[in-house]
Amino acid sequence: MTRNNADKFSIRKFSFGGLLLTALLLTAVTVALSADDRKVETIDATAMGTSTQLGKVVSVKVTIYEYSEEEDRQILMEAFTKGQNEGLVNALTKMKSVGRIAITGTIGYDLSFIRLVPTPTGRKIRFVTNRLLRFGEAYYNTQTTAFNLTAGEIDINDSDKDKSGGVLYPAAQLVINKEGQLEFQLNQNAWKLVNIIDWNKAGTLK
């Protein structure tokens, strides 16, 4: 096993003015659904337009057991304030699983935090979790181990299903830049999620 392949990556930076993790962690306007109100929900999507997977069909499956509560959001906010990205990762590691994400070619891993946000046309489902590191990354302690978050957003449009979409950040870290703003650093392009299939009308009372 060589180290070269594991070390080949480029850092991409995204200012966090209105992007999903800021909204995910800072907004308190969400819909609360108890476990008694809903059953397990499944959303399927196809990832497109990525630098590493361009030309391939990459399927993404998000399974939702329950939605995170306001208390969970506060825990993550405090953890990031105290320990920044590593504090956030450690807090996510200690949380119970509220869902699961599986990508083509992987066995999938647990989601630690899922938020439901109502929109005029439907709802957005936002999630973040600590990323499962590959053996080569951990063994060689490559630079990619710093990108230890996976986050995403699925925007469900009930009025026009063709307008449903989303984004997935497979490997990222949350930092504070020189201007004091939250910034998302990625070691590969964000994945655009299309062909959204909302099997159970996720986030609605049935």
Task: Give residue ranges: language-model regions.
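N-terminal secretory signal peptides that target proteins for export/translocation
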Residues: 1-14
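Intrinsically disordered, low-complexity, compositionally biased regions/tails
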Residues: 11, 21-22, 156
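Bacterial N-terminal signal peptides
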Residues: 17-29
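Sec/Tat signal peptide C-region and signal peptidase I cleavage site
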Residues: 30-35
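Long, low-hydrophobicity ectodomains and other hydrophilic envelope-associated domains
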Residues: 36-206
